[in-house]
């Protein structure tokens, strides 16, 4: 009861195809250059945007940009994220800038023409 040469070759090729797929899927990093690097950064960073060199606070002794990091060497997702810009505060995100007025804060208008009656009288004088 032997296995034919064709079946054993088919099993071997199937195993090799499966193994190569798994190894490629678990490869942690790859080289990215040119438009592929820019597209990947846009995908990773999204609306935040990105820098081609790291911000000054994250620079090591030897300053390298993302091209040196990812095109000439392999880079992973964590390294790509270090080049993302910090998100800008949106106009709708005002929770930190809201000032709470005390209950005893005066609520009367301050200024010459803030009171409606004063403004109305001035307007009537101009019409005359």
Swiss-Prot record:
InterPro entries named in the record: IGF2, Insulin-like, Insulin-like_growth_factor, Insulin-like_sf, Insulin_CS, Insulin_family
Chain intervals for the UniProt region annotation (C): 53-64
Feature type site, description Important for interaction with integrin: 48, 58, 61-62
Matching PROSITE patterns: INSULIN (PS00262)
CDD domains for the chain: IlGF (cd04368)
Region (B): 25-52
Residues cleaved off as propeptide: 92-128
GO terms for biological process, alphabetical: embryonic placenta development; embryonic placenta morphogenesis; glucose metabolic process; in utero embryonic development; negative regulation of muscle cell differentiation; negative regulation of transcription by RNA polymerase II; ossification; positive regulation of activated T cell proliferation
Sorted UniProt keywords: Carbohydrate metabolism, Cleavage on pair of basic residues, Disulfide bond, Glucose metabolism, Growth factor, Hormone, Mitogen, Osteogenesis, Secreted, Signal
Cystine residue pairs: 33-71, 45-84, 70-75
Subcellular location: Secreted
Highest taxon in the source lineage: Eukaryota
Extent of the signal sequence: 1-24
Cellular component GO terms held in the UniProt record: extracellular space
Region listing for A, in residue ranges: 65-85
GO MF term (any one): hormone activity
Gene3D superfamilies cross-referenced by the UniProt entry: Insulin-like
Residue numbers spanned by region D: 86-91
Pfam families given in the database record: Insulin (PF00049)
Subunit and partners: Interacts with MYORG; this interaction is required for IGF2 secretion. Interacts with integrins ITGAV:ITGB3 and ITGA6:ITGB4; integrin-binding is required for IGF2 signaling.
UniProt record similarity statement: Belongs to the insulin family.
Summary of the function given for this chain in its UniProt record: The insulin-like growth factors possess growth-promoting activity. Major fetal growth hormone in mammals. Plays a key role in regulating fetoplacental development. IGF2 is influenced by placental lactogen. Also involved in tissue differentiation. In adults, involved in glucose metabolism in adipose tissue, skeletal muscle and liver. Acts as a ligand for integrin which is required for IGF2 signaling. Positively regulates myogenic transcription factor MYOD1 function by facilitating the recruitment of transcriptional coactivators, thereby controlling muscle terminal differentiation.
Extra information: The IGF2 locus is imprinted. Paternal inherited gene is expressed, while the maternal inherited gene is imprinted, hence silenced.
Name of the molecule in the record: Insulin-like growth factor 2
Organism: Cavia porcellus
């Amino acid at each position: 009861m032997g296995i034919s040469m064709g079946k054993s070759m088919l099993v071997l090729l199937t195993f090799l195809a499966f193994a190569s797929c798994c190894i490629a899927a678990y490869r942690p990093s790859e080289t990215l250059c040119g438009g592929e690097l820019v597209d990947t950064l846009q995908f990773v960073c999204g609306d935040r945007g990105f820098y081609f060199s790291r911000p000054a606070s994250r620079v090591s002794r030897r300053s390298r940009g993302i091209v040196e990091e990812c095109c000439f060497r392999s880079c992973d997702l964590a390294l790509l994220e270090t080049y993302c810009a910090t998100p800008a505060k949106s106009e709708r995100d005002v929770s930190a800038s809201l000032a709470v007025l005390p209950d005893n804060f005066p609520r009367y208008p301050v200024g010459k023409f803030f009171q409606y009656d004063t403004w109305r009288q001035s307007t009537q004088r101009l019409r005359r």
